[in-house]
């Protein structure tokens, strides 16, 4: 975004994001790389935890356009679980053990049960519709109970409270990217939220998000046919 300060964070893996801006500022000041003839004149920092940080300054707007890019996309999907990267993109909006739940201690056993049931479901032969339907109904039932503890859209509310705009994400063949546009004076608070987001994501509201991913896929397929 040429009209804003741009930060692109590239994660080597889905791992906890360490941060302490003040402590490391002096250390980082003279330890960056640059790309020759880069029109954005970006500085590229590599933190001790392997995190790559790209900084490009534009002084006309007191806001920060942020991208957290995870180097995993649809080409990394297992052959028996296509769409997994896109699904994970959606699940990273569902909170952690510290936010997104009314009572995580009560919710957690149900989420573990759903996971175990789904793994069992995946092992059933596709032609065995009777057992697949039976197990899916069981998954659906437990998911309904677990959903009673979920707080919908809490991540979105948290970033909205610090003035974020354009909160979104997308999945490509090689990356999954999480997007926000935040006030520059809320950078440290945003880092706290994102650090927590990646520390221990909890995959709650399983059914709801699975349906949302399928709906997006159907819309994309329909659009491609209309443009053909």
Language model regions located:
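His/Glu-rich zincin catalytic helix
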Residues: 4-8, 12, 16-150, 177-184, ...
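Acidic/histidine-enriched alpha-helical segments
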Residues: 104-109, 202-218
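Alpha-helix-centered segments that form part of catalytic cores
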Residues: 143, 147-163
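Short, glycine-/polar-rich solvent-exposed loops and beta-turns at beta-strand/coil boundaries
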Residues: 60, 81, 170-173, 206, ...
